[in-house]
UniProtKB/Swiss-Prot annotation:
Protein name per the record: Saposin-C
Disulfide bonds: 5-78, 8-72, 36-47
Domain Saposin B-type: 1-81
Top-level taxonomic group: Eukaryota
Keyword set includes Glycoprotein: yes
Organism for this UniProt entry: Cavia porcellus (Guinea pig)
Length: 81
C-alpha cells in the first residue's frame, strides 16, 4: 500500500467520522479542512497534498455514498482488490 493510498483512506474515514453520516457538501469540505491538522507533522503534509489535489473529487464521491476504499481506488490512489 502506498503512503498516498493510506493517507487517502485516512482522510476519507476521518471525514466520514466528522460528518457523522450527515453528507452535505459544506460539511464534507469543512471536515476536509480540519482532518490533516489531527495528524503528526510527518504525515500531515501527505494528507494536505491529498486534500489539495483530490478534495473536490473526494467531496463528489462521498456525496455518492462511497466507502473510503472505493473513493481512493476511484481516484487511482489505491489498487482495488
Amino acid at each position: 500500500e502506498s503512503v498516498t493510498c493510506k493517507a487517502c483512506e485516512y482522510v476519507v474515514k476521518k471525514v466520514m467520522e466528522l460528518i457523522d453520516n450527515n453528507r452535505t457538501e459544506e460539511k464534507i469540505i469543512h471536515a476536509l479542512d480540519s482532518v490533516c491538522a489531527l495528524l503528526p507533522e510527518s504525515v500531515s503534509e501527505v494528507c494536505q497534498e491529498v486534500v489539495d489535489t483530490y478534495g473536490d473529487s473526494i467531496v463528489a464521491l462521498l456525496l455518492q455514498e462511497m466507502s473510503p476504499e472505493l473513493v481512493c481506488s476511484e481516484l487511482g490512489l489505491c489498487m482495488s482488490g
